[in-house]
Amino acid sequence: MERSPAVAGQFYPADPEELRKMIEWCFRHELGPGDLPETNDGPCTLPGVVAPHAGYQFSGPVAAHTYKVLAESGTPETVVILGPNHTGLGSAVATMTDGAWRTPLGSVEIDSEFATALVRKCGVMDDDLTAHANEHSIEVQLPFLQYVYGESFRFVPVCMAMHDLQTAREVGEAIVDVAEELDRNTVVIASTDFTHYEPHDQAQKKDRKVIERITALDEAGMIEIVERYNVSMCGVGPTAATIVAVKAMGASEGELLKYATSGDVSGDYSQVVGYAAIVFRRG
């Protein structure tokens, strides 16, 4: 089956040409990397990245940092996108094992072999369309991936409503096991925003503590900081699972490419959402 886009026309333009223009606006924005990426068609050398998932007018320039570095690091066969479940619907950890997701830029095929093996390997994961039908956190990553890679990749969506350490480790380890079994050149994307609806300075301070743990590849420490400082980061589980996966794939460090808040775009610093672009590199 083909999943229809849930947030086209809201989070990003529904018209293909307008969407391409907006993605290019994100890359060239003063908060973005400044120029368009040149995609490397060799195997991807990055094991994973972190990208935000708000409306493109707010978080798109930050996301563009992630996708520029990713594109220039090579072209993966399979992209596993881990996003939080905002709707509360469906299984607590859900993938889809067949079909495609449509965006204004075309359809992206699910890597059915990978997703099916993942459900078999990971005891907490179900094959469940309901969790994905109206969720935006994974969908908004696809147009960026389509812009830089065209139709050269397949993907696996993983929507998470569970954010505990044990679940994150189970999911992250299963992703790596399947990638190795299938010999897939795989990149893992954690889709997350950081602090929600707090003053800019307060959001920055909280988010800096969390990002320090992410770039140190410390999934347990990240969860502990989120809990201790009551950080309203939505993608805790997806980010923790991504850290687990990239460490097993040989990552030695994470690098913060860009941090900004919605206030940096809108000029309203009273109630902001934090966004970060992070890449994980092998040693």
UniProtKB/Swiss-Prot annotation:
Extent of the signal sequence: none
InterPro entries recorded: MEMO1_fam
Q: Which HAMAP family match?
A: MEMO1
Annotated family? Belongs to the MEMO1 family.
- PANTHER family attached to this UniProt entry: PROTEIN MEMO1
For this entry, the protein name equals: MEMO1 family protein MK0963
